[in-house]
Amino acid sequence: MDWLSKYWWILVLVFLVGVLLNVIKDLKRVDHKKFLANKPELPPHRDFNDKWDDDDNWPKKDQKK
């Protein structure tokens, strides 16, 4: 078990290389042209910043000093 305490980082690197190879292999199977052709429509985005628009504290441009 002495070797494990010295060379644990090699096992981590082997694990990360395996994960990386599996990700590359899975990404090769994705057909991006088919996905883009049948892309679903996104619903309209609603943010909650519209209530801040009413609290406009900016000075008016045509005010005289």
From Swiss-Prot:
Stretches for region Disordered: 39-65
Membrane topology: Single-pass membrane protein
Matches recorded under InterPro entries: UPF0370 (IPR020910)
Domain of life: Bacteria
Transmembrane segments: 4-24
Pfam families the record matches: UPF0370
Disulphide bonds in the chain: none
One annotated Gene Ontology cellular component of this protein: plasma membrane
UniProt entry tagged with the keyword Membrane: yes
Subcellular location: Cell membrane
Record family assignment: Belongs to the UPF0370 family.
Protein name: UPF0370 protein Ent638_2968
Organism of origin: Enterobacter sp. (strain 638)
